[in-house]
Amino acid sequence: PAPESNFVRDP
């Protein structure tokens, strides 16, 4: 999976 999946962006 892409590394971006590791990041949880705030709404």
Curated annotation (Swiss-Prot):
It comes from the Eukaryota. Its main location: secreted. It is found in: Secreted. GO terms for cellular component: extracellular region. The keyword Secreted applies. GO terms for biological process: neuropeptide signaling pathway. The keyword Nucleus does not apply. Keywords: Neuropeptide, Secreted. FMRFamides and FMRFamide-like peptides are neuropeptides. Belongs to the FARP (FMRF amide related peptide) family. This is Extended FMRFamide-10. It comes from Namaquaphasma ookiepense (Gladiator bug).
